[in-house]
From Swiss-Prot:
GO-annotated molecular function: DNA-binding transcription factor activity, RNA polymerase II-specific; RNA polymerase II cis-regulatory region sequence-specific DNA binding; RNA polymerase II-specific DNA-binding transcription factor binding
SMART domains: HOX (SM00389)
Region (Disordered): 1-58, 168-191
Organism: Caenorhabditis elegans
Composition bias type Low complexity, residue spans: 1-25
A biological process from GO: nematode male tail tip morphogenesis
Official protein name in the record: Homeobox protein egl-5
InterPro entries in the record: Antp_homeobox, HD, HD_metazoa, Homeobox_CS, Homeodomain-like_sf
Function statement: Involved in control of cell fate and pattern formation along the anterior-posterior axis, acting mainly in the tail. Required during embryonic and postembryonic development. Essential for the determination of specific neurons, including the PLM touch neurons. Plays a role in neural fate specification in the hermaphrodite-specific neuron (HSN)/PHB neuron lineage, acting in concert with T-box protein tbx-2 and the asymmetric cell division protein ham-1.
Family designation: Belongs to the Abd-B homeobox family.
Pfam family, one: Homeodomain
Subunit structure: Interacts with the TCF transcription factor pop-1.
GO cellular component terms, A-Z: nucleus
Broad class of the protein's primary localization: nucleus
Length: 223
């Protein structure tokens, strides 16, 4: 009798312990899900109170936190919106692609125009008259031209160099033109030409004959 009673007590205690474990395991599962959700929501944000140390949820679940760290990086790698990001992924970018210094084309154009010398009409006429006499001038002649035109010796040299180049180009153009034009004698002999009477005879012979006048070709107007 005592044996059956003890067996009944053991069965009841086992059932009660199983029920207790079942009821206690359900809150543990819910708590695990809530902690997992809280930990996933914290990824990408930085809490000022816990910015220096990992969160307690991460310490409780090292396996899951390690997976998130491997996939997304630790939260301190992400800053708040509006804050600068971390160092660039390619630190060698400035060395590979330095800033290109574009030239100032305005200054280059101004400098090129600044170096060009302009001559007045009186100066050009004096230099041109001297060039018609001789395309090369000596030092003494350049000194005379300098006193007449108020130009420097270098400016006079440059003008004569440019003038000789211009004359050379003009001569080359004339030579090219004469090579392509047919050469005809200026005064052909009389045997090659025709007199005025012969030319008129030739024209009359090759013109079409004029139609004979027929007074009845057109109808007469009524009186």
């Amino acid at each position: 009798m005592n044996t059956s009673t003890s067996a009944f007590d053991f069965g009841s205690s086992t059932a009660s312990s199983a029920a207790t474990s079942t009821t206690s395991s359900q809150p543990d599962a819910n708590d695990h899900l809530s902690r997992l959700a809280a930990m996933t929501q914290g990824v990408g944000k930085e809490d000022p109170e816990t910015s220096s140390t990992p969160s307690t949820e991460a310490s409780l679940y090292p396996g899951i936190s390690a997976a998130y760290m491997q996939s997304y990086g630790w939260p301190q790698n992400y800053n708040y919106f509006g804050q600068p990001l971390g160092p660039a992924t390619f630190p060698g970018w400035p060395q590979c692609y330095p800033n290109t210094a574009w030239p100032n084309y305005g200054e280059l154009f101004a400098s090129s125009k600044k170096g060009r010398q302009t001559y007045q009409r009186y100066q050009t006429s004096v230099l041109e008259a001297k060039f018609q006499q001789s395309s090369y001038v000596s030092k003494k002649q350049r000194e005379e031209l300098r006193l007449q035109t108020q130009l420097t010796d270098r400016q006079i040299k440059i003008w004569f160099q440019n003038r000789r180049m211009k004359a050379k180009k003009e001569k080359q153009r004339v030579d090219d033109h004469t090579e392509h034009t047919p050469l005809l004698p200026a005064n052909p002999p009389k045997g090659m030409g025709m007199d005025m009477d012969d030319e008129k005879k030739w024209q009359m012979a090759h013109w079409p004959p004029a139609a004979a006048h027929n007074p009845y070709q057109y109808p007469l107007c009524p009186p």
